[in-house]
Amino acid sequence: MLDIRVVRQDPEGVARGLARRGLAAGLEHFLELDARRRNLLVEVEGLKNRRNQVSAEVARLKKSGQDATELIASMREVGERIKELDEKVRAVEEELRQEMLKLPNIPHASVPDGLSDADNKPVRHWGELPRFKFEPRPHWEIAENLGIVDFERGGKVAGARFVFYRGAGARLERALINFMLDLHTIKHGYTEIFPPYMVNSASMLGTGQLPKFAEDMFHVEGTDYYLIPTAEVPVTNLYRGEILPGEKLPIYHVAYSACFRAEAGAAGRDTRGLIRQHQFNKVELVKFTRPEDSYEELEKLTRDAEEVLQLLGLPYRVVALCAGDLGFSAAKTYDLEVWMPGTACYREISSCSNFEDFQARRADIRFRPGPKEKPRLVHTLNGSGVAVGRTVAAILENYQQEDGTVLIPPALKPYMGGLTSIQPEQD
């Protein structure tokens, strides 16, 4: 959530930031509500002052034995009016809060201008694109021929955008999870968290999924539970409503979880393969930092995610998202896009974002800089470290052989029991 004081003091600057995202709607309704709130507060304050004066006059009259009946009656009327206005103030403040919850974060000054992914800016490339002496196949075709992913039975048992991994496919998925967790905990210094797969609405609001993206979430009917769309939600909310000791920052957490997304806006997109599933696995990196350190920490977090792809030998590029392509809560985002030779394109495999104090304000996550200093909002960051199913897809396409088998990347062999290649599964 944006700082309401900034919106009040610099509405033109906030409107310019929102316009960079392609949001033409101004802040007129917010400013109108805020003015109404201020007018109500002025009226309430005036009535309370009057009530205090009348109370003093009533006390004086009673002390001198005079009749104060009329003043007492008028004071009752003032009290009723104050009560009525207090209700109006609460209603306007709630409406203001709902307006603030709808506003996305303001893009950082370093974010490129633009309104769609066509305006995103490549930052760097890593690795050489593989060359094949045959026509490379897409990962879903490779997986089906090897018998390691069952798309048809996934659809039968659960519906579209669900799959079964089997045999070496299931083993590869598990190997990648363990490989990523070991890299981030042992080498990069993250503390592992194993979070709940369901959270309450306060947690969804804290990270920015609610109220705007309710239709993209799986909600357990009749309860306050939501299936998590990413481990970012439970791990960020780990410290919701808390004041962290300043000396503990930065805090680095890594979490593996299954993720659940309705993909309400993705009808007709990526209907084949592992790229867009309702349920998928991901290893997530989450950081809590001091405000002055957060952009340096974003660069580190991005490099930590990149190392996964480098160790697996998967060519990729880093792209800075333009203002119009940023996620709702992000102030700046780098996407890692892995090369997919079967479809001859780069596909997102990780998003690494700095949310500044946007999530922390919604979730009330603060830190105390020093023993006698006032608490301040932390900055939160997160990034995929990385999406597991998409990594499986990238390995199948980049390590495919002409005979239909797939080589195991050297870094994964210890996690695959020494297996050097994936051969067709036997029914």
UniProtKB/Swiss-Prot annotation:
GO MF annotation: an example: serine-tRNA ligase activity
Keyword RNA-binding: no
EC numbers, comma separated: 6.1.1.11
GO biological process, any: selenocysteine biosynthetic process
Record's function text: Catalyzes the attachment of serine to tRNA(Ser). Is also able to aminoacylate tRNA(Sec) with serine, to form the misacylated tRNA L-seryl-tRNA(Sec), which will be further converted into selenocysteinyl-tRNA(Sec).
Organism ancestry: Bacteria, Bacillati, Bacillota, Clostridia, Moorellales
Major subcellular site: cytoplasm
Keyword NAD applies: no
Keywords: Aminoacyl-tRNA synthetase, ATP-binding, Cytoplasm, Ligase, Nucleotide-binding, Protein biosynthesis
Coiled coil (UniProt feature): none
Protein name: Serine--tRNA ligase
Domain-level remarks: Consists of two distinct domains, a catalytic core and a N-terminal extension that is involved in tRNA binding.
Binding site for L-serine: 230-232, 284, 384
Enzymatic reactions: tRNA(Ser) + L-serine + ATP = L-seryl-tRNA(Ser) + AMP + diphosphate + H(+); tRNA(Sec) + L-serine + ATP = L-seryl-tRNA(Sec) + AMP + diphosphate + H(+)
InterPro entries for the chain: aa-tRNA-synt_IIb, aa-tRNA-synth_II, aa-tRNA-synth_II/BPL/LPL, Ser-tRNA-ligase_type_1, Ser-tRNA-synth_1_N, SerRS_1_N_sf, SerRS_core, tRNA-bd_arm
Organism: Moorella thermoacetica (strain ATCC 39073 / JCM 9320)
GO cellular component, one term: cytoplasm
Pathway given in the UniProt record: Aminoacyl-tRNA biosynthesis; selenocysteinyl-tRNA(Sec) biosynthesis; L-seryl-tRNA(Sec) from L-serine and tRNA(Sec): step 1/1
